[in-house]
């Protein structure tokens, strides 16, 4: 009995978890939030290829490139932190201008001293990964214009399209934000017949593009945070090129029907083939019931991914994904369309989201029962056949025993 008591006491001592107490007796203990990682080294995945070039005094968001691959939201034991390369302290420290929301680091407003390399670190109980993002903050002067501008190209004598980029987080957080377009210092108002609204405030159409339309454009969005308004400026350099031989874009995905489960996160890529060799000015976007995605879903439940252009075996492709987070029943009755357009041709492909059947299948559940019935039926038939054969043999024997044979001559 004494030996049994010693064994039980020893096992309980080894299995009791270590806890950190808050210091108040009335409060329950909480476990330490720092995950255990084998070794203290993180695997560095490299630097994000795109640097963030922003203006001083404006809001800035830095996205962690590891987030789409880490599935942070689905695990309560995963952690994502931010730090600056020249500092060992984690962000936000005591800096009221910086905070972390999900996988995004917010800086509001940005100052030139914020320029530098930022490290996002993803940890869980089994591994640790890091990637870096470069931020450069410039003064809002004419001299900084070439450094902070996005290059966009339009073909001569065609309908040009300007896109105000990198506003996803601000639009979803500020549904009432207004966007105004400027060419140089001139406001492009609704009365201007050459510049037309595309139905989406982040896009501007240029009717019959000419060489005079080349130059610098600005799109300015008003963003309100804690009752204070901030301007978010994106500068665009438009270059107009003469008509060239453009390839006809061929949309090779998605399928006409996309299976999905309600409540799940869904990514539908629109992949467009652009031919071989030469580069292309093809633009790809998504529509929902003939409405731009940002206008159809101002809260950001459905969004467009980045415009990704790449090559495979000397073949050029461009890809833009449609991201559902999450899928709802409304999506089952929505006509989604991927559009690929360049000066030579415009192509589109419709697709719909279809709810997949439940993971529980009656055919699978009834399969064992059907097998049992089949086996029992086979056994019953076998026994029945044996009984019939036995009865036939008995009757034959009985008739043979009772048959009268003619007597022998003797």
Swiss-Prot record:
Ig-like C2-type domain sequence ranges: 35-136, 146-237, 249-357
Pfam family, one: ig
Chief location of this protein within or outside the cell: membrane
Tissue: Strongly expressed in B-cells, with levels 21 times higher than IL1R1. In T-cells expressed 5 times more compared with IL1R1.
Localization: Membrane; Cell membrane; Secreted
Segment forming the signal sequence: 1-13
Residues in compartment: Extracellular: 14-355
Topology with respect to the bilayer: Single-pass type I membrane protein
InterPro entries reported in the protein's UniProt record: Ig-like_dom (IPR007110), Ig-like_dom_sf (IPR036179), Ig-like_fold (IPR013783), Ig_sub (IPR003599), Ig_sub2 (IPR003598), IL-1_rcpt_fam (IPR015621), IL-1_rcpt_I/II-typ (IPR004074), IL-1_rcpt_II-typ (IPR004077)
PTM info: A soluble form (sIL1R2) can also be produced by proteolytic cleavage at the cell surface (shedding) involving a metalloproteinase.
MF terms (GO), sorted A to Z: interleukin-1 binding; interleukin-1 receptor activity; interleukin-1, type II, blocking receptor activity
Membrane side Cytoplasmic: residue ranges: 382-410
Record bears the keyword Transmembrane helix: yes
Cysteine pairs bridged by disulfides in the record: 42-128, 64-120, 164-219, 270-338
Keywords: Cell membrane, Disulfide bond, Glycoprotein, Immunoglobulin domain, Membrane, Receptor, Repeat, Secreted, Signal, Transmembrane, Transmembrane helix
Assembly with partners or alone: Associates with IL1RAP to form a non-signaling interleukin-1 receptor complex.
Family membership: Belongs to the interleukin-1 receptor family.
Protein name (database record): Interleukin-1 receptor type 2
The encoding gene: Il1r2
